[in-house]
């Protein structure tokens, strides 16, 4: 006897899982019916009576079909080998079922109210179809049905006020049903607001997502427009939809995200304020908006904010990290400039655009002699705090150039600082460069890629033409100055190579400073002897057939052209000398024009 194939075992296991799920749903349905109030049971009984079902029958479940004799097609389906797709019995049954459902949906849209009971009876005659059907096909059919059902339900709820006298009589039978009618508009609003919930709600109205064909057809026949009174749900159902709806969850999630974002920004601001040393400025709570921070600033900040209201408004509108330089800091710098304190107050990075706007407003508010000082002193350093020492020394240097009481000596002056003039006090230079922020150090490169530094001290030294110097002084000057220096044309004497290799462009910089660099060495005697070119006269004596005719060296191009013309005339006049003259002319042309 052959072993059972794997696909058949998988099919049997899937069928067992489906049966277990169906049994669980049956149990849940029975529990729900036992806990249901009497008025709702009466509504369900009236629905069954309209559909033509016996009134005493319980909830239609597929377990009743399982108790009967097995379907004759079932054994054939399980024993059949999987052949081509179009001949598979599962595929054929699924196609028939889909065609029936599409036809039924068309009938529902057209208002055919008799399709529901006929379909119920048809499905009850062949209950084995449900078990042959795979769960994926069932889920896809439910998803196909649910948007149309939701649309039909919306239409029915919209026309619920124009109900017939029969449905009004049904509602008058119990006052609790009249109360239930009042919950209709809220449900309609929920269905319109959240279309993603329509599959779950359509299944819940049928009863806890039951997959039985009778229950589905009950639900579909409910949706006919003439019976709006039958679609009222119990308050428990309304309560379930309220609990299970995703809109309050979405709103609460949005609120949580908003509070998290505010808390995060508040924590960042608090960390920054503690790092800057201004701990007296506390945030009242993590959800304080950014524009309310003006109320927390100290009294001196309030005064300066009154002096410049637009500037303080701009700073408070920026984020917590960009709001580093307050108006109080700018005022203290302009009134009593203390460079080390200002450099300590601005250790962190800042927004470049906000700084430029603030500096423009400062330049308009203050007088001209203070512009250069503000541009050089009030700009916060974008480098980490370890560079604040060099910034402080640079500001001390600039203030020492102005007529002020002497400050302590600079800590680490750059090498080019003593020789370069300092036109920082010039109002013309400050007017030119007031929009550009100077760098953190005099010679240090800027690390931000969006702004460039214009230092006016670089272009100030006068250009004095230096006389040709000897190699020793050239080397000393090259090693003394900080930048790279190339030798001039007067300093180089070429004899097939450079006299000193340290002055050639093969060596980048002087070898005295770069000890680890590659050292290149040639033997100068070999270069001198090897690359010595022979004279043209000797070459012509070796190659030319007539050495008795001397050839003068051609100095310039016009002389060469004149001689060529003369040679052409000689060729025309003396045809006997054509060969020798032509050979020598070619040799001269090749040697000179290269």
Swiss-Prot record:
The keyword Membrane does not apply. The modification N6-acetyllysine is found at residue 437. The modification Phosphothreonine is found at residue 198. Residues 18-238, 294-485, 531-577 are annotated as: Disordered. It holds the Pfam family Phostensin. InterPro entries: Phostensin/Taperin_N_dom (IPR025903), Phostensin/Taperin_PP1-bd_dom (IPR025907), PPP1R18/Tprn (IPR026671). Disulfide bonds: none annotated. One of its GO terms (cellular component) is cytoskeleton. Coiled coil: none annotated. The modification Phosphoserine is found at residues 126, 134, 174, 194, 224, 412, 510. It is found in: Cytoplasm, Cytoskeleton. Residues 18-33, 109-125, 133-155, 167-190 have a biased composition (Basic and acidic residues). GO terms for molecular function: actin binding; phosphatase binding. Keywords: Acetylation, Actin-binding, Cytoplasm, Cytoskeleton, Phosphoprotein. Its main location: cytoplasm. It comes from the Eukaryota. Residues 403-421 have a biased composition (Pro residues). The keyword DNA damage does not apply. Residues 353-364, 558-571 have a biased composition (Acidic residues). Interacts with Protein phosphatase 1 (PP1). May target protein phosphatase 1 to F-actin cytoskeleton. This is Phostensin. The lineage of its organism: Eukaryota, Metazoa, Chordata, Craniata, Vertebrata.
């Amino acid at each position: 006897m052959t072993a059972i194939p794997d696909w058949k075992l998988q099919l049997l296991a899937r069928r067992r899982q489906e049966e277990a799920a169906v049994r669980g749903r049956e149990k849940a349905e029975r529990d729900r019916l036992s806990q249901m109030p009497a008025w709702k049971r009466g509504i369900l009984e009236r629905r069954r009576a309209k559909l033509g079902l016996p009134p005493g029958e319980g909830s239609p479940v597929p377990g009743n079909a399982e108790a009967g004799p097995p379907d004759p097609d079932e054994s054939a389906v399980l024993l059949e080998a999987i052949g081509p797709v179009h001949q598979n019995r599962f595929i054929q049954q699924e196609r028939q079922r889909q065609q029936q459902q599409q036809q039924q949906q068309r009938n529902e849209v057209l208002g055919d109210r008799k399709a529901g009971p006929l379909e119920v009876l048809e499905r009850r005659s062949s209950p084995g179809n449900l078990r042959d059907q795979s769960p994926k096909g069932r889920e896809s059919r439910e998803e196909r049905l649910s948007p149309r059902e939701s649309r039909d339900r919306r239409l029915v709820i919209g026309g619920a006020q124009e109900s017939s006298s029969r449905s009004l009589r049904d509602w008058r039978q119990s006052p609790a049903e009249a109360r239930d009618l009042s919950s209709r508009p809220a449900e309609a609003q929920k269905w319109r607001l959240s279309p993603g919930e329509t599959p779950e709600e359509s299944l819940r109205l049928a009863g806890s997502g039951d997959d039985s064909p009778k229950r589905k057809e009950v639900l579909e026949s409910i949706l006919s427009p003439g019976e709006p009174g039958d679609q009222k749900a119990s308050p428990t159902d309304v309560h379930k939809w309220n609990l299970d709806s995703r809109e309050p969850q979405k709103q609460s999630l949005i609120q949580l995200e908003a509070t998290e974002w505010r808390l995060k920004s508040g924590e960042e601001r608090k960390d920054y304020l503690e790092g800057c040393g201004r701990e007296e400025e506390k945030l009242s709570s993590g959800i304080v908006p950014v524009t309310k921070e003006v109320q927390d600033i100290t009294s001196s900040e309030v005064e300066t904010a009154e002096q410049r209201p637009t500037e303080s408004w701009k700073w408070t509108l920026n984020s917590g990290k960009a709001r580093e330089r307050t108006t109080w800091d700018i005022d203290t710098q302009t009134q009593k400039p203390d460079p080390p304190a200002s450099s300590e107050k601005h250790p962190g990075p800042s927004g470049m655009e906000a700084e430029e706007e603030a500096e423009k407003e400062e330049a308009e508010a203050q007088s001209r002699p203070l512009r250069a000082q503000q541009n050089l002193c009030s700009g916060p350093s974008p480098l980490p705090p370890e560079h604040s020492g060099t910034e402080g020394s640079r500001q001390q240097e600039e203030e020492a150039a102005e007529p002020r009481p002497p400050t302590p000596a600079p800590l680490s002056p750059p090498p080019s600082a003593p020789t370069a003039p300092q036109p920082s006090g010039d109002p013309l230079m400050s007017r030119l460069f007031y929009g550009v922020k100077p760098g953190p150090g005099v010679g240090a490169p800027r690390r931000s890629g969006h702004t460039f530094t214009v230092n006016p001290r670089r272009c100030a030294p006068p250009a004095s033409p230096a006389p040709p110097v000897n190699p020793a002084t050239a080397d000393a000057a090259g090693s003394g100055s900080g930048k790279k220096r190339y030798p001039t044309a007067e300093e180089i004497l070429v004899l097939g190579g450079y006299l000193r290799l340290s002055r050639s462009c093969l060596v980048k910089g002087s070898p005295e400073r770069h000890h680890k660099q590659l050292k290149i060495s040639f033997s100068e005697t070999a270069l001198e002897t090897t690359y010595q070119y022979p004279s043209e006269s000797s070459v012509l004596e070796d190659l030319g057939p007539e050495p008795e005719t001397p050839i003068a060296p051609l100095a310039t191009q016009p002389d060469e052209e004149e001689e060529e013309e003369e040679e052409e005339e000689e060729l025309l006049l003396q045809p006997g000398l054509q060969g020798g003259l032509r050979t020598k002319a070619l040799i001269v042309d090749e040697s000179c024009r290269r």
